[in-house]
């Protein structure tokens, strides 16, 4: 058993509009308020398709060089030097149509062939098909690369901001299309097993538009839930 850290999340304060100086100033203020952890939320990634709004960049998990020219690692080091731990936001199950990931792997999404892309409506994002072992490897790789390239990250906010619609799989055979829901869950659990095996001591908080995944299966892997998105900056 460990007590959960008191944290400050930058999302409500600046959303997509930030730079390194802004974040470090917020981290210092959070420390002065008594917070133990500073969490960088959405907007830190994407270069060809910068994550400056929710239209683009999701799936391209490399640090945005314009906002953070010295990288995530420098933020971790400076926050740690100020006496506050550092956490980061990921939504590795999702992708925007405006992303290099989708451009390179359009067959990795959940989608009924022959229908229009169903990315309008839930933050303009699509769901990656976790029934596909290649997608499972990619999603694990997002987490693993983020952690190994930025030593000192103590916390992950794992988000999931849309539900499954237009459900179809380019990976599953025709006679297994109705299995996409359960095969997706099994694929996700395989990824989380790998994450927990390699990073057993990392805090992982689950968010899904708030408490949209508040269930025992996910609590097994992520014992902390973001109960509601109905929040403010302070």
Question: Where are the predicted features?
Answer:
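Active-site neighborhood of glycoside hydrolase catalytic domains
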Residues: 64-71, 81, 103-234
């Amino acid at each position: 058993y460990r007590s959960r850290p008191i944290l400050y999340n930058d999302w409500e304060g600046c959303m997509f509009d930030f730079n390194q100086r802004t974040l470090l100033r917020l981290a210092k203020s959070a420390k002065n308020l008594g917070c133990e952890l500073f969490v960088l939320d959405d907007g830190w990634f994407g270069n060809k398709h910068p994550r400056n709004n929710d239209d683009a960049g999701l799936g391209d998990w490399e640090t945005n060089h314009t906002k953070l020219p010295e990288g995530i690692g420098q933020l971790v080091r400076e926050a740690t030097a100020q006496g506050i731990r550092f956490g980061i936001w990921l939504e590795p199950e999702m992708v925007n149509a405006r992303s290099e990931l989708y451009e390179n792997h359009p067959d990795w999404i959940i989608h009924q062939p022959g229908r229009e892309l169903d990315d309008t409506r839930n933050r303009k994002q699509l769901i990656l098909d976790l029934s596909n072992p290649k997608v499972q490897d990619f999603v694990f790789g997002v987490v693993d690369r983020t952690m190994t390239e930025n030593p000192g990250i103590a916390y992950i906010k794992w988000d999931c901001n849309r539900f499954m619609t237009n459900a179809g799989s380019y990976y599953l055979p025709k006679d297994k299309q109705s299995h996409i829901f359960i095969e997706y869950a099994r694929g996700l659990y395989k990824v989380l097993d790998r994450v927990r095996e390699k990073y057993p001591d990392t805090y992982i908080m689950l968010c899904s538009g708030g408490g949209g995944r508040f269930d025992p299966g996910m609590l097994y892997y992520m014992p902390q839930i973001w109960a509601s998105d109905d929040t403010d900056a302070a």
